[in-house]
């Protein structure tokens, strides 16, 4: 009986995860963990929270999001290149706002893993992340 319940909950979690818009495959040294996704009171908009971890020396290339991104650094230090601005290095406790559809990239400039809590306020139903050449 207990096994059935656990399997049922597991199927629900897997089913819920598969409904999320597809993001690029995990890159070596980069781990993205979807934490939550909720509709907003504004039609066609949703908020998404993701924990993003980068191993030391790893970079995540240029990309955009279909809405605003607010970054809160949890640990380590990451350098961000945001289109039209000088590079900025964030450490634990720092925050960064990235406007909608702004090209940006990140890399871990430290000797320890870097982790951020990324909060996105985006257009519902669009891919959360689009890589840029």
Predicted regions and their residues:
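A short, N-terminal "cap"/entry segment at the start of jelly-roll beta-barrel domains
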Residues: 2-51, 97, 127-133
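A short beta-loop-beta micro-motif enriched in histidine and acidic residues
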Residues: 45-47, 57-72
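Conserved hydrophobic/aromatic beta-strand scaffold that supports enzyme active sites
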Residues: 49-51, 70, 95-97, 118-119
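Short acidic-glycine-tyrosine-enriched beta hairpin
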Residues: 54, 84-101
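Short histidine-centered beta-strand/loop micro-motifs
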Residues: 60-65, 82, 89, 107-109, ...
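Glycine- and acidic-residue-biased ligand/ion/polar-headgroup-sensing regions
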Residues: 66-84, 94
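Ligand-binding loop in jelly-roll beta-barrel domains
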Residues: 79, 87, 101-126
